[in-house]
């Protein structure tokens, strides 16, 4: 974590959280749509 001097930690956490929620949402949506097995 030496290269995070110019990037705020809260920004990294926010982007990471949004990405995780998006991936999780797509996975759940895919499971309900029946295409979750293709992932």
From Swiss-Prot:
Domain of life the protein comes from: Eukaryota
PANTHER family: PHOTOSYSTEM II REACTION CENTER PROTEIN J (PTHR34812:SF3)
Pfam families xref list: PsbJ (PF01788)
Protein name listed in UniProt: Photosystem II reaction center protein J
Membrane topology of the entry: Single-pass membrane protein
Subcellular location per the Swiss-Prot or TrEMBL entry: Plastid, Chloroplast thylakoid membrane
Originating organism: Pyropia yezoensis (Susabi-nori)
GO cellular component terms given for this protein: chloroplast thylakoid membrane; photosystem II reaction center
Family: Belongs to the PsbJ family.
Functional description taken from the UniProt entry: One of the components of the core complex of photosystem II (PSII). PSII is a light-driven water:plastoquinone oxidoreductase that uses light energy to abstract electrons from H(2)O, generating O(2) and a proton gradient subsequently used for ATP formation. It consists of a core antenna complex that captures photons, and an electron transfer chain that converts photonic excitation into a charge separation.
NCBIfam families for this protein: PRK02565.1 (NF002722)
InterPro entries, per database record: PSII_PsbJ, PSII_PsbJ_sf
Transmembrane segments: 9-29
Keywords: Chloroplast, Membrane, Photosynthesis, Photosystem II, Plastid, Reaction center, Thylakoid, Transmembrane, Transmembrane helix
The keyword Thylakoid is assigned to this record: yes
Oligomeric form and interacting partners: PSII is composed of 1 copy each of membrane proteins PsbA, PsbB, PsbC, PsbD, PsbE, PsbF, PsbH, PsbI, PsbJ, PsbK, PsbL, PsbM, PsbT, PsbX, PsbY, PsbZ, Psb30/Ycf12, at least 3 peripheral proteins of the oxygen-evolving complex and a large number of cofactors. It forms dimeric complexes.
HAMAP family named in the record: PSII_PsbJ (MF_01305)
